[in-house]
Structures are given as C-alpha cells and as structure tokens.
C-alpha cells in the first residue's frame, strides 16, 4: 500500500529521466502490442493485478492500456473516482484504497472508528456495484500501545464494519506491513497478530492482505505460512527482497514456488505486483514479473 511520501519518493529516485522513460514506455507498448497481435495468453491459474502507485509517471489511461496488453485483470490501490477509467478498459480494481487515516492512523485507535466506518458505509456499495472484491484497511501505528490493546481496538472497529461488508459481499482486508524497514511502528506487522485479529472479528468478510515482501522482512517462512494460514489471506502482494525492486533473480525470493504454493491452496483471488521497477523500462519489468508469477 502506498504511503504519502515514502513510496512516491522512492519511485522518483529510481525512475530514469523523462526522455529515457518515454523511450522505454514506447518500447514496452510495442512489445505488448506484439503480444496482443500474436494472441499471447497467460495460464489462468493466477488472477494478476498491479499496484498503480509503482508507475506514477505513467498516466492511468495509458497504464490501463499497457496492463491489458500484458494480460492483467486489475489495476489496484485506486479510488472510486478511478473506477470509470478501469471499466472503460475492462479492468477491475482488486484492492480499493481511500480509507481515512491511511497506514499510520488506523483501527487500533477508537477515536478513528467513526470516520472509518463512515468511509465503508459510503464506499462499499459503490465497490459492490462495480463488482470489485476488496477494500484495504490498516491497523495504524503502535505509538506505545500494546499488541493486545491494538487487537481489541481493531476488533471493535471491524465488528462495526463487517456487517456492511457482509451485506454487499465485499471483503475488508488489513494489510500486513513490515515495521523494520518501511513502516516503523506499524502494528499489524506479523501474520500471527493478523490471524488472531481475523479470529476475533469472526467474519468471512474480514481477512488479511498478505504482502510477501513485507512478511519476508519480518518473519520469512513464506510458503509454510501460506499453507498454514491461507484461509485468512484474501489477497497477495509481491516485491523483491531486499530493495522492493524486480522479483527476478536479483533478489532472494523464489516467486515461482510461492505462486505454486498459493495455487495449491485453492486460492481464487488476486496476486498484485507491488515492486518498484529499478530498470529504465518499467513496463518490461512489470511484464517480466507477471510472467514469473504465471505458474
């Protein structure tokens, strides 16, 4: 999930100059067009999505065209205002963004609950109307709060949100994020804590967004964790470790094996690419990442 500053700053630092980006984008579009012309298709065992914030310099319409060419079914972490553009290109938003407070100020503070509940009251019917599956939420930072108190407070808020999600058949997903590198002090930073929260809330419409990049940093043991807890995971994000760049052999995770593990659990949701392209052709990196995950 995108922060207000850190992810944007990272993208600006690693993306090349405007001329290089334009040339790379042109090349990517030609490659994608060639795929479309020859009827290249993905295998269909993974529903592929991508987080738009990683490609901020590419306008949404242009990005949607490229996403369709690669074979993606979704562009995510977007707002309700972006839905008509996605619909125009036959794309879903597999994870809808916009919850008040963002990452740092979330459901672990009782004083945040009213505005968060209001957001879900207003947004969930629209998400359901478009047929999109998930809306993201966050625990917020600890700020000296105990993990037990954070669990209790989050459960109180989510028990108010769950009936809305159940009514409209939309899943509310709390993202697991690392607190070592990117999101210092974030409370939902271990899968064990997130699973305990799911059990307290007790609704099939509240689950976790299991971010593979973040959880590799916090706890590792990715495949075993997925096998043991997949019933609590509604959505997955990728990213290379270390660095959060391409998911190829420049980083330590075996994404092909991880995707096979996800498929073997019977998962029918989405896997979204959320790495920050380091190479000068970001769309070629995206296409490569989708190919790696298309097991």
Each language-model region and where it sits:
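Histidine-acidic metal/acid-base catalytic patches
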Residues: 2-68, 132-133, 188-210, 214-295
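Active-site acidic/histidine proton-transfer and metal-coordination neighborhood
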Residues: 14-26, 40-42, 106-207, 217, ...
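Active-site mouth loops of central-metabolism enzymes
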Residues: 49-57, 104-115
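Active-site-proximal loop/turn and secondary-structure-junction residues that shape catalytic pockets
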Residues: 54-56, 79-81, 99-101, 141-143, ...
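Catalytic domains of carbohydrate-active enzymes, especially glycoside hydrolases
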Residues: 63-82
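Short acidic, glycine/proline-enriched helix-loop-strand junctions
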Residues: 84-96
């Amino acid at each position: 999930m995108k922060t207000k500053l850190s992810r944007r700053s990272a993208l600006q630092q690693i993306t090349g100059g405007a001329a290089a980006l334009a040339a790379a984008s042109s090349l990517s579009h030609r490659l994608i067009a060639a795929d479309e012309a020859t009827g290249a298709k993905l295998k269909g065992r993974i529903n592929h999505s991508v987080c738009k914030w990683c490609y901020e310099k590419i306008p949404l319409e242009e990005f949607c065209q490229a996403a369709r060419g690669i074979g993606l079914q979704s562009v995510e972490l977007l707002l309700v205002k972006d839905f008509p553009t996605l619909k125009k290109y036959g794309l879903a938003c597999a994870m809808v963004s916009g919850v008040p407070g963002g990452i740092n100020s979330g459901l672990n503070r009782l004083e945040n609950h009213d505005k968060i509940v209001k957001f879900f009251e207003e947004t969930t019917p629209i998400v359901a109307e478009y047929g999109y599956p998930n809306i993201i939420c966050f625990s917020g930072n600890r700020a000296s709060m105990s993990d037990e108190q954070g669990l209790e407070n989050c459960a109180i808020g989510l028990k108010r949100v769950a009936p809305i999600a159940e009514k409209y058949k939309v899943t509310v997903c709390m993202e697991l994020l690392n607190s070592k590198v990117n999101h210092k002090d974030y409370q939902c930073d271990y899968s064990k804590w997130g699973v305990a929260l799911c059990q307290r809330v007790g609704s099939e419409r509240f689950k976790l967004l299991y971010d593979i990049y973040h959880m590799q940093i916090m706890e590792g043991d990715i495949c075993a964790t997925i096998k043991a807890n997949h019933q609590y995971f509604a959505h997955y994000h990728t990213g290379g470790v270390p660095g959060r760049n391409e998911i190829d052999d420049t980083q330590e995770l075996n994404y092909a094996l991880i995707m096979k593990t996800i498929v073997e659990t019977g998962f029918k949701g989405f896997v979204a690419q959320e790495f920050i392209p380091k190479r000068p052709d970001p769309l070629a990196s995206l296409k490569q990442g989708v190919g790696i995950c298309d097991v």
